[in-house]
Amino acid sequence: MSRLIIPSHSPNEEGNVVRVTPESVGWEYVGFEVYVLAKGQTLRKETKDQEACLVLLKGKANISTKLERWEQIGLRMDVFEKVPPYSVYVPANDVYEVEAMTDVEVAVCLAPGKGTYPARLIPPSEVGVEIRGAGNIERRVHNILPESQPADSLLVVEVFTPEGNWSSYPPHKHDQDNLPHESYLEETYYHKINPGHGFMVQRVYTDDRSIDETMVVKNGDVVLVPKGYHPVSAPPGYEGYYLNVMAGPVRTWKFHNDPDHDWVMESKLAAKQKEK
């Protein structure tokens, strides 16, 4: 198996099914965890020197921090309902507790924090929804924690790719600290597939091909993007979902398209305009 794939596993005692830490994968900024909790189960964690964004992938829960509490939050029972999720931002040096009111799947997105901002609820009404691309590179995007919203390091977004379409396309990268043209951001992809026995295809490659891997990605896999371009393809019959977590030295998303394929977006958008 590729070193860029972290597969999920059966829930352990605290419900964890996948965990990525900077130490475990050899980078500096992004951490990512997913917990599957049975109704009535409680997860309690300290954030320490990291900030967290808890994304309720499915189910309803009570979530509390040192100073705040939100009850019965959660709107969707499956990510493929395609409605924006409830999320909770938790600063560094805080504590969060998730009490499952139904069966719950919660993603914990992590990055270095300074405790600048207080804990807050991110309701579905505050999640920006956009349709990005056109034709067979069109996808639905939910901007959960974009750079326009306060956080110290984290950027969080979820994307739905229709069957037969490509996503994160044209291929782009953000691996150079070269602002204002490009930012350095590590990234994780947490993949879900509908139906669940299907697969996605993701390629991660650099200009010099020091990394060039094309991977078959299964339901629940995490793909690591330490650097390079990273397009995704959804085969016919299977729609894809992924939750992205990004973080780096500067909290801004400035990307650079692969010049060999940059023309594709302009061509697709022009074709879409002709159809109107």
From Swiss-Prot:
A Pfam family annotated for this UniProt entry: KduI
Record Gene3D superfamilies: Jelly Rolls
Keyword Isomerase in annotation: yes
Top-level taxon in the UniProt lineage: Bacteria
Record carries keyword Isomerase: yes
Family designation: Belongs to the isomerase IolB family.
Name of the protein in question: 5-deoxy-glucuronate isomerase
Organism: Geobacillus kaustophilus (strain HTA426)
